[in-house]
């Protein structure tokens, strides 16, 4: 049998950390653009503010540690963390919240444990949980998508509301001053309606829902899905974790929907609501805090998907990805210990 042999050299090129981070950031852009289109300029302002704070904190910590500031900033990890925090919080959250969350992510979660490659938890999700637990009202106050809002804030309006230093912050002023802009997310709305005794069909008759998914959120998730597929094509991430997350969430939500369609949302709703695609391709795939073996990555991803469904349906926080990712981060060493690949010539561990 004749074998086809490729010409030399046979050495594959390893991607540098900065290159991987650049690719992830570029693939995030479609989702960021669509998110800004539906939820206004506030998202972009939050992202830019987070980047400034993250790079400043990164430089300050490197200076204190007598490390190269240029090398640390050029790996783009701080910028990626900042973007993930910026797109995760409500567009018109007060400025001090994004500052607090970003400082916590970079200084405490990342560098307190030794810097890039040593952190135990995903910095962006740890920051999100800190803000959500500390300021639940502000963190659950999103603005209505532009397609259903009576008024859409301009760039100037967004800046004024974000940087308002009043006691209640920009979002509170928004609720009092402009009708038809602030509202709960589809996940929050559905969970509240179900607790009041409404069926899924009755809840989804509201204007915030369209075609079984949330208005705006379907397209945001679709954009992050497109970016994630490009990321897979570029081989910046492996397919195991993303597949595990989506499969775990799909299977769990399908079982729930089949058992009780009147009180459970469809798998389509779960897959294209909240931060599902963002988390599946850009957050859960963090190589530092995830499991390492192929089989371990699948288990890690599936665990996140199942936890998301359980927390969304039984917990107090409808979009549960931050908690699910952090809990899976805790389980990653355990998964790696019991799902180690067998070394050639040795028995299984």
UniProtKB/Swiss-Prot annotation:
Name of the gene this protein is made from: rnfD
FMN phosphoryl threonine modified-residue sites: 185
InterPro entries: NqrB/RnfD, RnfD_bac
UniProt-recorded name of the protein: Ion-translocating oxidoreductase complex subunit D
GO process annotations (BP): electron transport chain; transmembrane transport
Ranges that cross the membrane: 36-56, 77-99, 124-144, 212-232, 239-259, 265-285, 291-311, 315-335
Gene Ontology cellular-component annotations: plasma membrane
EC numbers: 7.-.-.-
EC top class, as a word: translocase
Pfam families, sorted: NQR2_RnfD_RnfE
Protein localization: Cell inner membrane
Organism: Shewanella sp. (strain MR-4)
Assembly behavior: The complex is composed of six subunits: RnfA, RnfB, RnfC, RnfD, RnfE and RnfG.
Family: Belongs to the NqrB/RnfD family.
Keyword Ribosomal protein found: no
Function (record text): Part of a membrane-bound complex that couples electron transfer with translocation of ions across the membrane.
Cofactor(s) in the UniProt record: FMN
The organism's place on the tree of life at top rank: Bacteria
């Amino acid at each position: 049998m004749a074998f086809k042999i490729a010409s030399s050299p046979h050495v594959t090129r390893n991607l540098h950390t900065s290159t991987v981070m650049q690719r992830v950031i570029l693939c995030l852009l479609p989702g960021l653009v669509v998110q800004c289109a539906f939820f206004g300029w506030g998202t972009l302002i939050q992202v830019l503010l987070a980047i400034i704070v993250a790079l400043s904190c990164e430089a300050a910590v490197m200076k204190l540690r007598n490390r190269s500031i240029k090398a640390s900033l050029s790996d783009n990890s701080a910028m990626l963390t900042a973007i993930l925090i910026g797109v995760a919080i409500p567009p018109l959250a007060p400025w001090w919240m994004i500052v607090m969350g970003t400082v916590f992510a970079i200084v405490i979660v990342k560098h307190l444990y030794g810097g890039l490659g040593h952190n135990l938890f995903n910095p962006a999700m740890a920051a999100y949980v800190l803000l959500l637990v500390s300021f639940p009202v502000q963190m659950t106050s999103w603005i209505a998508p532009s397609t259903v809002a009576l008024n859409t804030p301009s760039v100037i309006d967004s800046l004024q509301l974000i940087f308002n230093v009043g006691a209640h912050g920009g979002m509170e002023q928004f609720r009092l001053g402009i009708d038809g802009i602030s509202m709960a997310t589809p996940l929050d709305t559905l969970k509240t309606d179900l607790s009041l005794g409404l069926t899924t069909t009755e809840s989804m008759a509201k204007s915030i829902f369209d075609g079984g998914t949330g208005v705006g959120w379907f397209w945001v998730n679709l954009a992050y899905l497109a970016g994630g597929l490009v990321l897979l094509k570029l081989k910046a991430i492996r397919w195991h974790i993303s597949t595990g997350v989506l499969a775990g969430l799909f299977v769990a939500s399908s079982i729930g929907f089949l058992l009780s369609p009147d009180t459970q949302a469809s798998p389509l709703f779960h897959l294209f609501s909240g931060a599902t695609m963002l988390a599946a391709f850009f957050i859960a795939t963090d190589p530092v805090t995830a499991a390492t073996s192929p089989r371990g990555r699948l288990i890690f991803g599936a665990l996140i998907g199942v936890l998301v469904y359980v927390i969304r349906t039984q917990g107090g926080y409808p979009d549960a990805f931050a908690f699910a990712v952090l809990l899976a981060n805790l389980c990653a060493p355990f998964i790696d210990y019991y799902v180690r690949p067998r070394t050639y010539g040795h028995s299984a561990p």
